[in-house]
Design a protein with these regions (language model features):
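Cysteine-centered catalytic environments shared across enzyme families
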Residues: 1-170
Length: 170
């Protein structure tokens, strides 16, 4: 179980605010946490993550996961990640981790949003392509992994925890 959260709006987070947001997700992932801020059309895209190591406990698998100009925060497990990894290797992709997170970001890089149809498992993730200025927020077909969101005016917030959304907005 991991924790993910994101914010798109005009607010920037200082170090204390980042820690407070990450603290709300600590129980979901005590092994590591991460934060990334990306400027997006005069707004800020802030990605928060708390990690519970399951498949790959190497620090290279920490999140937000970055590949080229793409970013991913992911909670869940892709059961067929080895099959997808093999297909992607045949397309010329190389891998630095054993993580299904790396497989997911490269699957989305190669297949785009159609890569979601290839996934077998349980997940909630946010993928952002900074070149295309396009984001994908996805949840597995059965809703096994939690996902909550808030949208009003120029702010969009999502998280695997409701209390995290509240902390981001305050």
């Amino acid at each position: 179980m991991c924790g993910i959260a994101g914010y798109l709006g005009k607010k920037r987070f200082d170090t204390k605010e980042i820690k407070k947001v990450l603290d709300t997700m600590y129980r979901r992932g005590p092994d590591s946490n991460g934060f990334k801020e990306i400027t997006y059309r005069k707004k800020f895209l802030s990605l928060f993550f708390s990690r519970l190591n399951i498949i790959d406990d190497n620090n290279r698998a920490n999140q937000p996961f970055v590949y080229k100009d793409k970013y991913l925060i992911f909670n869940g497990e892709i059961y067929n990640h080895l099959e997808l990894k093999s297909q992607l290797k045949n397309k010329g992709y190389n891998f630095k981790t054993q993580s299904d997170t790396e497989v997911l970001i490269k699957a989305l890089d190669y297949w785009g949003e159609y890569g979601i149809k290839k996934l077998e498992g349980m997940w909630t993730f946010f993928f952002y392509d900074n070149t295309k200025k396009k984001g994908i927020l996805s949840r597995d077909r059965f809703g096994e992994k939690p996902l909550f969101y808030y949208h009003k005016n120029d702010e969009f917030v999502f998280s695997s925890e409701i209390k995290t959304i509240s902390k981001i907005l305050n």
